[in-house]
Amino acid sequence: MNDMNENEEGTGRDWGGTMAFLVLRGWLAVRAILTGIEKFGAYKTIQKPLIDPATGMEDPSGAMLDVKVKVYALTNYAGIPAPLRDKLVNEPLLPHPVLTAFDHLLGPALILTGMMLLLGLGTRASLFLQGLMYIALTVGLILIRQDDGVAWLGIHVALVAFALMLAKHNKFALLKKW
């Protein structure tokens, strides 16, 4: 037996392929989930009292510091970051209703497909949907000439395609057919 197709003796299972798929599936799932969650994050500035480093107590003068903290809330949601959205709004090849729908659905779709992938619920379907989302994001970035982002998304599309090829090694899933 060669190392490329190393099977457990007599089981017919390619554990290397299974482990490769699990690692890639895990990475793509975590990437999608956290990217979707980040769509609900924003920075808020709060004031905190200045702490005297020598005593560890609040400064007696009452001096305050502005500190940025990250908070997550439904009201913070922005599927497409404002600077990109401002550029995309003026793009004639991107209809406004499509941009609005994509902006509203991107975060929840990333979280949903990421969770599906992580749990093994419709693994192939969730990978395919993620691939379509990355293609749609690529179209937008091409239109506003964000070539670095296009290259990064190309890598994501390649990873999704590779995961779809490895899906035959998906041994740990709740719904294997999809």
Predicted features and spans:
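Extended, low-polarity transmembrane helix blocks
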Residues: 1-112, 119-178
